[in-house]
Design a protein with these regions (language model features):
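A short, polar/charged loop-to-alpha-helix boundary motif
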Residues: 106-114
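AMP-binding/adenylate-forming catalytic core of the ANL superfamily
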Residues: 1-79, 88-91, 96, 102-105
Length: 114
């Protein structure tokens, strides 16, 4: 199996190269999952860690633990996402592709409490 991905999307976690497409390919097969995207989030110890964003198919719910178990069964431990985020929809650019830069920007903004 050979995964082809954009070099700028590659995540370097503790010296290991992680290609988001590899994680996305596995996560897309999880029950109830419609769309997936993986981006890197800065980590003070490891450099970057992968974060998986998923959306649910209409009428379905995404079981985050089931997605995590599927990923753990299929991927090396260092490739597992540090976090799985379920969104109503993924941001898209004007041509309809998933806007990964928007997801990276969202991760860079500190969460606020209500």
């Amino acid at each position: 199996l050979r995964i082809v991905d954009r070099i700028k999307d590659m995540i370097i976690k503790g010296g290991e190269n992680i290609y988001p497409k590899e994680i996305e390919a596995v996560a897309a097969g999880a029950d109830g999952v419609l769309e997936v995207a993986v981006v890197g989030r800065a980590d003070p110890r490891l450099g970057e860690v992968p974060v998986l964003f998923v959306t649910a198919r209409p009428g379905a719910l995404v079981d985050v633990e089931a997605v995590r178990s599927l990923l753990a069964a299929e991927l090396s431990r260092f490739k597992l996402p540090a976090e799985i985020v379920v969104l109503e929809h993924l941001p898209k650019n004007p041509v309809g592709k998933i806007d990964k830069p928007a997801l990276r920007r969202a991760l860079a903004v500190p969460a606020t409490s209500p």
